[in-house]
Amino acid sequence: MAKFKIRPATASDCSDILRLIKELAKYEYMEDQVILTEKDLLEDGFGEHPFYHCLVAEVPKEHWTPEGHSIVGFAMYYFTYDPWIGKLLYLEDFFVMSDYRGFGIGSEILKNLSQVAMKCRCSSMHFLVAEWNEPSINFYKRRGASDLSSEEGWRLFKIDKEYLLKMAAEE
């Protein structure tokens, strides 16, 4: 399959984006943790001040999925700021359906993300990869990615909504 197109997502792609988010979550054994809705995606990504940006990989009709989907991959990203090095592109989610891997779709998405990062004068792209996900780790390392967990000793933390509410209410 030589034909596919990488393009910015539109509001009409939200159902496909959610479908792929759920497929990625299933791949990562976290399917039950997706609570996001299509409405959330629409409001959060396509309003006046979008919280995220998204690229999608689209194949022509002769390569649609058996279920009739033309969108077979996506990358969700946003911009953040590091006070030491400046602007960063943060890659939140990146997924290509298993039947469509090995055709250069993932590489082309990453190329497009790199072009976006350079156009916006970002100093780097950051992302997380599950420790067990060797195929993805190798995919990124082949393209020059560094593992900051092992090289710099950073640890990822989160504060859940319950605790955010508690701290926000403190007097």
Curated annotation (Swiss-Prot):
It is found in: Cytoplasm, Cytosol. Substrate binds at Y27, E28, E92, H126, F127, L128, E152. GO terms for biological process: polyamine biosynthetic process; putrescine catabolic process; spermidine acetylation. Gene3D superfamilies: 3.40.630.30. Residues 4-170 form the N-acetyltransferase domain. Pathway: Amine and polyamine degradation; putrescine degradation; N-acetylputrescine from putrescine: step 1/1. Pfam families: Acetyltransf_1 (PF00583). GO terms for molecular function: diamine N-acetyltransferase activity; N-acetyltransferase activity; spermidine binding. Acetyl-CoA binds at residues 94-96, 102-107, 133-136, 140-143. GO terms for cellular component: cytosol. PROSITE patterns: GNAT (PS51186). InterPro entries: Acyl_CoA_acyltransferase, Diverse_Substrate_AcTransf, GNAT_dom. The active site is at Y140 (proton donor). It catalyses: an alkane-alpha,omega-diamine + acetyl-CoA = an N-acetylalkane-alpha,omega-diamine + CoA + H(+); spermidine + acetyl-CoA = N(1)-acetylspermidine + CoA + H(+); spermine + acetyl-CoA = N(1)-acetylspermine + CoA + H(+). Its EC number is 2.3.1.57. It comes from the Eukaryota. Keywords: Acyltransferase, Cytoplasm, Transferase. Belongs to the acetyltransferase family. Enzyme which catalyzes the acetylation of polyamines. Substrate specificity: norspermidine = spermidine >> spermine > N(1)-acetylspermine. This highly regulated enzyme allows a fine attenuation of the intracellular concentration of polyamines. Also involved in the regulation of polyamine transport out of cells. Also acts on 1,3-diaminopropane and 1,5-diaminopentane. Homodimer. This is Diamine acetyltransferase 1. It comes from Mus saxicola (Brown spiny mouse). The gene is Sat1.
